[in-house]
Amino acid sequence: MEKSKRLFLKSKRSFRRRLPPIQSGDRIDYRNMSLISRFISEQGKILSRRVNRLTLKQQRLITIAIKQARILSLLPFLNNEKQFERSESTAGATGLRTINK
């Protein structure tokens, strides 16, 4: 019985703790593009808190800074290059439909 109980005990493995994405000296500001760009996806969307590994307060400040940068035209609202490629190829195919009676 003693031996079977010992089989279920797992050895504690040490793991490397990840560095926080925002250091104590970093200032969250709409002008700090190098910091803000780390928290935006390729499409220009704000990444979630779980993906960023930020605290609630940090995520709120990052979101406000990104929105201010967008309003002041420092960041684009959308960064969807595929949309433009697709619209050029389908531009000739669209037309008015006529109803035959």
From Swiss-Prot:
Subcellular localization: Plastid, Chloroplast
Organism from which the protein derives: Eucalyptus globulus subsp. globulus (Tasmanian blue gum)
Subunit organization: Part of the 30S ribosomal subunit.
Major subcellular site: plastid
GO molecular function: small ribosomal subunit rRNA binding; structural constituent of ribosome
Cellular component, GO, one term: mitochondrial small ribosomal subunit
Record protein name field: Small ribosomal subunit protein bS18c
Alphabetized Pfam families for the sequence: Ribosomal_S18
Domain of life: Eukaryota
Family according to the record: Belongs to the bacterial ribosomal protein bS18 family.
PANTHER family for the chain: 30S RIBOSOMAL PROTEIN S18 (PTHR13479), SMALL RIBOSOMAL SUBUNIT PROTEIN BS18M (PTHR13479:SF40)
Annotated GO biological process: translation
RNA-binding listed as a keyword: yes
Gene3D superfamilies: Ribosomal protein S18 (4.10.640.10)
Keyword vocabulary terms for this entry: Chloroplast, Plastid, Ribonucleoprotein, Ribosomal protein, RNA-binding, rRNA-binding
